[in-house]
């Protein structure tokens, strides 16, 4: 029985360390990426996974070592994993609608009017096109008011 307790404690410790490592990678990604969309992707995907691993590790630790099952911990695990992606989706959507900068790796998509170009002339044209599309969307959206 004692060896099983030690194995589960080791599994809980590994999950805590793995969750901490993924959170560190998420923090590096938030600092390293260039625009709000890439940063939100790094923040949401990896932080959700890191919180999941960390809370499962804590849950296993408490069940094995103290015999205590926390419903609050389980509810927080479910709540964070449901609300974090939805919240970041809304932030990215608001940034897109307000015309936030979109990073471009290369000029492979020059036909796309939404993407920003590296030179100033195409960049201002792309910004004007995006502003026109936003205005059309607003008119269509608020037409019924």
From Swiss-Prot:
Pfam families, sorted: PhaG_MnhG_YufB
Main location per the UniProt record: membrane
Transmembrane segments: 11-31, 51-71, 72-92
Molecular function via GO: sodium:proton antiporter activity
Topology relative to the membrane: Multi-pass membrane protein
Intracellular or extracellular location(s): Cell membrane
Keywords attached to this entry: Antiport, Cell membrane, Ion transport, Membrane, Transmembrane, Transmembrane helix, Transport
GO cellular component entries: plasma membrane
The organism's place on the tree of life at top rank: Bacteria
The keyword Membrane appears for this protein: yes
NCBIfam families (UniProt xref): CPA3_mnhG_phaG, PRK12586.1, PRK12674.1-2
Protein's job: Expression of the mnh2 operon in E.coli is not able to catalyze Na(+)Li(+)/H(+) antiport. It does however confer higher growth rates than the control strain at up to pH 9.5. The operon may encode an NADH-ubiquinone oxidoreductase.
PANTHER family hit by this protein: ANTIPORTER SUBUNIT MNHG2-RELATED (PTHR34703:SF1)
Family the entry assigns: Belongs to the CPA3 antiporters (TC 2.A.63) subunit G family.
Subunit annotation: May form a heterooligomeric complex that consists of seven subunits: mnhA2, mnhB2, mnhC2, mnhD2, mnhE2, mnhF2 and mnhG2.
Name used for this protein in its record: Putative antiporter subunit mnhG2
Native species: Staphylococcus aureus
């Amino acid at each position: 029985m004692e060896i099983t307790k030690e194995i589960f404690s080791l599994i809980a410790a590994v999950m805590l360390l793995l969750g901490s490592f993924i959170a560190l990678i998420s923090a590096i990604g938030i600092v390293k990426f260039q625009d709000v969309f890439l940063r939100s992707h790094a923040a949401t995907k990896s932080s959700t996974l890191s919180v999941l691993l960390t809370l499962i590790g804590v849950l296993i630790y408490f069940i094995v070592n103290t015999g205590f099952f926390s419903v609050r911990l389980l509810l927080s695990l479910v709540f964070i994993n449901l609300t974090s992606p939805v919240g970041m989706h809304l932030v990215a959507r608001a940034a897109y609608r307000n015309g936030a900068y979109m990073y471009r790796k290369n000029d492979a998509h020059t036909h796309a009017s939404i993407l920003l170009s590296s030179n100033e002339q195409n960049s201002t044209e792309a910004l004007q096109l995006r502003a026109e599309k936003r205005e059309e969307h607003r008119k269509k959206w608020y037409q019924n008011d």
